[in-house]
Amino acid sequence: MTARKPFWETKSLNQMTVPEWESLCDGCGLCCLVRFEDEDTGEIIPTRVHCQLFDEHRCTCKDYANRKKTVPDCIKLTPHNIETLEWMPPSCAYRRLHEGKTLPLWHPLITGDRESVHQAGVSVRDQTVSELSFSDPEDALDFVATDLMYDKSDVDWDPEEP
């Protein structure tokens, strides 16, 4: 008997069910960071400042179901807008699958462990500050973090080491 391939290898993003789509999120937290766009160059500038609803230790949204009410500019990822979201980190499963790439070895769907993204050092767990810490949103520019946006898909990670 041959093993059945996982859904992310057999379905397009458009064909996935809502639970399948949601399970692609590795929980790194990179998409919950405040970003700026340089008006002259169009360059996206990531920061170590997270959305007010982001739980910096769990790397999850504190009110995912209602997030758009509190944070109207929160972008809901869909199969229809993923190609326009060039600011998504290169290691993001949504972006990788859209680009025809595989999931990284540390991805929770591969490991079966939601902690693997943190153990591999890919997430922003406990490395960010809340946007609520600033009276002026532009102060987030003091926390520019271009280092967070390099491709972490192939990090040297040993699942046996904590």
From Swiss-Prot:
<protein>
    <recommendedName>
        <fullName>UPF0260 protein Caul_3920</fullName>
    </recommendedName>
</protein>
<dbReference type="InterPro" id="IPR008228">
    <property type="entry name" value="UCP006173"/>
</dbReference>
<dbReference type="InterPro" id="IPR005358">
    <property type="entry name" value="Puta_zinc/iron-chelating_dom"/>
</dbReference>
<dbReference type="Pfam" id="PF03692">
    <property type="entry name" value="CxxCxxCC"/>
</dbReference>
<comment type="similarity">
    <text>Belongs to the UPF0260 family.</text>
</comment>
